[in-house]
Every structure is written in structure tokens, then in C-alpha cells.
């Protein structure tokens, strides 16, 4: 339930979501396991996992969705060795060299033969659709995986007018100024981790972890032109995270004190607790995004 990373997109055209219509749209793209000949399958699954009953979990016009991916694990080395053995056998029997086209056909045949015996692995990715702040937050550190989920959602809905979140002023310029002044704008506080990078290829990258960022050693790198591309921050007393210059938010962690707000919810009803946690997380993520947009100088105008 609790998101661990954020890849953020914003709507660049008006967008409204009707829970019932969204549920119906996703139903046509529900996840189903791989058959014996499938290399991978990707589709929507229950938003709240085994405890849930729907593909979309909504509250206060905030919508949680989940997609499941199953992939067959067929090591390329296994296919390569089987192919080499088969090619050697045929070339010896027929006393000739096989053409590339023939080898490609053999490779496909071998893959088809091996797939039913291959192990598979599953992964899930969640996203939070937030019309009130015109954003979609994807719980992934990988833009590629986030785009894969959005592509599936776009296919289900017919259209999805979103673009990656970007700001009027480069994030690295803002973070560099914060570090120079040893002060992040409220309600954010700098922590003890940063990554500094030079604009030139020769300048290199310097990483600091568990270190006082006000020390001269750190500031010296700023004086020679390096900029801050990653900075660990706290949002009030609720969230710790690392903000990146590409607007990615990594290692998102909600504090124990914040999560304890729902301790009074009965543990005898796990679904009720999940619902309460969803509401709590959604509200705080909205507050986080609104504050980030404000202190970073506003979002870049849509094209």
C-alpha cells in the first residue's frame, strides 16, 4: 500500500475520472497468467490485492490502480547453447553452413520448445490518479516501467493526456541554491545525503552520504561549478525521500509516527485498515506534491 518511489506525470488537458467507467474500461485489460507459449503477460489486477474486489479503489476522487506483469525466465545462454548444438548437428549431417535465416528459425523453434518448462516471475506496479492536483503518481523508480503502465492505461481509456512533471526552473539549480544557503524552504529540511555533478564530462560525480552537507569539503565542489542532482529531504515529520533533478522521487518513506495515525483502526478488519492507509497516504502525497511545486518555482507550462 505505502508507495516507495514516485515517477510523476501531470495532465496537460482537462481530465475527469468516473470510478464506475474507469473500472469498466480496465476490465477489458485484466491480467491473466502466461500460457505455455507466452513470454510475458501484463494487465490490471485488484487495486488492494487479495483483500480487494475491484480493479480501481477510490476515495475522495483519488483512484488507486494496479497492474501485474508475469515474465518467463528463459536465460539467453540456455537458448544460445541449445542453438549452437542444433546448428552444429545439422551442419555436420548436411555438410553445409546454415544461413542466418535458418539459424533465426531454429532459435524461434528452440524458444518455443523451452518456454513451457521455463520458470516465471511476477511483479506489480501501482499508480495513484489524482484529478484534484491534475497528476498521476506511479510507484516506481523506473520511468520505463511507469510508461509501460501508462501505455496500458491509455489503451484501456482510449486517451490519457499526461506528460512527465517538469518545472520552470531546473531542479538542480534550485537544489544547488538550497545547499549553498544551507536551508531548504519550509516545510522541507535537508538531510545528510547528496549527489553533485559537473556539467562537463570531465567534472565527474561526487556522492555524499551520512555527512554534514555544510562542511567545506562539500561546498568546495559547488564553488568549482558542480550542481546538486540528488538531495535527501524530509517533508515535515511525515515523509523522507530523495529528490532528483529529473523530478524523480526515490526511497520514499513514511515515518512510523505518521503511519501510526491509523493505529486506532481495528486490525480485525484488514480491508478497513488498507482503506484508511490509502486515505492517509493520498492526502499526504497531495500535500507533498503541492509543496514541491510551490518551493521549486512552479510547473513548466504545458506545450
UniProtKB/Swiss-Prot annotation:
InterPro entries: RdgC (IPR007476)
Function: May be involved in recombination.
Keyword annotations from UniProtKB, A to Z: Cytoplasm, DNA recombination
Cellular localisation: Cytoplasm, Nucleoid
Assigned protein family: Belongs to the RdgC family.
Keyword Cytoplasm: yes
Pfam families in the record: RdgC
A GO-annotated cellular component: cytoplasm
Source species, domain of life: Bacteria
GO molecular function: double-stranded DNA binding
Gene Ontology process terms (BP): DNA recombination; regulation of DNA recombination
Principal location: cytoplasm
Keyword field contains Cytoplasm: yes
Protein name: Recombination-associated protein RdgC
